[in-house]
């Protein structure tokens, strides 16, 4: 298992440049007539929420600075002006309070979108998320649903230290009653968020701060107000020699690694973007392993009890085990609280060279 290369290497860090915004009510329409057909993840999330707020009067957004400040990361820009303070609600700095309020609203039939400024702060509201929201439908014998979304930035950023860099995908992925989504591209963000808002179950929607300003090509289909995505994995790059299964920002590093492996070593790597942690698309994972006979998983979480560990267990317990020609490798974050110093922070998370090195070891390439 790899957590990093033995030498410190520069990481391709997504820039957090300011983004210009189209008014949410016209964002998707403007793109339909644009020759570029690109959208940032931030714009995708913004347009998804705008369309769902417009579609259903029971949907509302609540959280710290989501209204007058347009969101800490400007994801909710323009929503207050369009929908008013009854639908876009600023709160005090009290995650336990506003999350409990939102869960109560969901139990009464409304459809809240709860924004955490960071999912690290969701720990202040963990009882409401994993007990009240996740378990009520089951404990009521299916008579009481709790339709809501918990969303916000999750995982590592740049220079924010140990208490603001954790990836909570394994935490929430272990809870029955929750669905956990992990978008990578603008199309992922738009389609999955719209699906999550319409889902009758509570959904944890884990975004990545460093992807907010990244632009992606987006299809005509994805610009439709009715566009949603299923909670299924996506093959981002076809390959025949090894499968790289990953999610959110590590998809970017995995695609870069696949390009290097092809050009430098003639290795054809298949890159699988999970898009959903719970439900986990085990069928897609088994299928790619049976195709390539080799597997590595890539995540920025701590090594122990992570998403990669669950994937390894699922593969070992399935028919895919008989197709493996080498042990599975996990590429993870380091087993330490995230350092603040840049040199140490760079060393704490996977990047493109780390993935290349792991693939070479699995395939016994010198």
UniProtKB/Swiss-Prot annotation:
SMART domains: Transket_pyr. It catalyses: N(6)-[(R)-lipoyl]-L-lysyl-[protein] + pyruvate + H(+) = N(6)-[(R)-S(8)-acetyldihydrolipoyl]-L-lysyl-[protein] + CO2. Residues 1-33 form a transit peptide. K(+) binds at residues 196-197, 199, 201. The pyruvate dehydrogenase complex catalyzes the overall conversion of pyruvate to acetyl-CoA and CO(2). Pyruvate dehydrogenase (E1) is a tetramer of 2 alpha and 2 beta subunits. Eukaryotic pyruvate dehydrogenase (PDH) complexes are organized as a core consisting of the oligomeric dihydrolipoamide acetyl-transferase (E2), around which are arranged multiple copies of pyruvate dehydrogenase (E1), dihydrolipoamide dehydrogenase (E3) and protein X (E3BP) bound by non-covalent bonds. Pfam families: Transket_pyr, Transketolase_C. It is found in: Mitochondrion matrix. The keyword Hydrolase does not apply. GO terms for molecular function: metal ion binding; pyruvate dehydrogenase (acetyl-transferring) activity. GO terms for cellular component: mitochondrial nucleoid; mitochondrion; pyruvate dehydrogenase complex. The lineage of its organism: Eukaryota, Fungi, Dikarya, Ascomycota, Saccharomycotina. Keywords: Metal-binding, Mitochondrion, Oxidoreductase, Potassium, Pyruvate, Thiamine pyrophosphate, Transit peptide. Thiamine diphosphate binds at residue 95. This is Pyruvate dehydrogenase E1 component subunit beta, mitochondrial. Its EC number is 1.2.4.1. InterPro entries: PDHB_mito-type, THDP-binding, Transketo_C/PFOR_II, Transketolase-like_Pyr-bd, Transketolase_C. It comes from the Eukaryota. GO terms for biological process: pyruvate decarboxylation to acetyl-CoA. Gene3D superfamilies: 3.40.50.920, 3.40.50.970. Present with 9970 molecules/cell in log phase SD medium. Its cofactor is thiamine diphosphate.
